[in-house]
Amino acid sequence: PSYTFVSTADAFVLRGATCVFVDIRPDTMNIDETKIEEAITEKTKAIVPVHYAGVSCAMDEIMAIAKKYNLKVVEDAAQGVNAFYKGKALGTIGDFGCYSFHETKNYSMGEGGAILFQDDRYLEPAEILREKGTNRSQYFRGQIDKYTWVGYGSSYLPSDMNAAYLWAQLEEADKINDKRLSIWNFYHEELKELEDKGVLERPYIPEYATHNAHMYYIKVKDLRVRTKLLAYLKERGILSVFHYVPLHSATAGKKFGRFHGEDVYTTKESERLCRLPMYYSLSLEEAAEVVKALKEFPEYETIEDR
């Protein structure tokens, strides 16, 4: 999808690949699985589903397409730690899965992430890539008597302090998840009234998805209304922000990628979306202030094509 963070594309562009973007689903903001097959050519190597807001893409359909065309599936599960598709952890369904532990994520070490893969053959090259192109990991395990430069790589190692900070959160993962879900559910229940009035839309969670309350967003009629709403919330001391600018509209996106088919929803939906405050230390009282402000916003317009 074009509606994602630039890192999704960078990983491929840095290796000389061309990114082919397809449209998203307006309900989940995830890649539209029905648009994938028509974008595949003899040059296609992989399908990259992005689990937006920790809500799973339709992975059965995506995996079936990948199998049909002998393609790899690389899950961008940056926002998907402790979220699931039909009971299976996001990032563990495709050939590869990528997690992020950036400061904005549910479990954070400031920067950094993790890669998961199904095939053990990728373990050694992944370690070499992480260890500056050396076989240092094997040396530390006592498998070799000295380490040396064996391939290309860079320095992707977190410090012990970063790792310890993350580990402590992972030990409390259920507690963190429960707290975030309580905030998410509070927003969802309290904002139903405005959705029923037709002035905003709440997130949609498919039956197959178990989300992790990574974010709570609303969608208003259009960019004009959103701009007014964000300014209004800022005046009330509430930080609400939009999210991605679609990659295919960016200078580099036009240079290194292309959009296949018609952009029916990607740009339109991205211009409607506002993210509400969502973090572990947010109290329900503070969330109630956000809801109160949203209910008092005077310039909503009816969403006519809901």
Regions found by a protein language model. Name each.
Residues P1-A77, F84:
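PLP-dependent aminotransferase-like
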Residues Y3-T4, A17, I24, A78-Q79, ...:
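Histidine-centered beta-alpha loop that forms part of the nucleotide-sugar donor binding/catalytic region
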Residues F5, M29, G54-V55, E103-M109, ...:
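Nucleotide-sugar-dependent glycosyltransferase donor-binding/catalytic pocket residues
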Residues F21, V73-E75, Y99, F117, ...:
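Hydrophobic residues in well-ordered beta-strands that form the structural core
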Residues D27-T28, V81, N106, H248-S249:
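Positions that flank functional sites
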Residues T34, E38, A46-V50, V55, ...:
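PLP-dependent aminotransferase class I/II
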Residues E75-M109, Q138-Y139, D145-V150:
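Conserved active-site segment immediately N-terminal to the catalytic lysine
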Residues T92-R136, D160:
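Active-site PLP attachment segment
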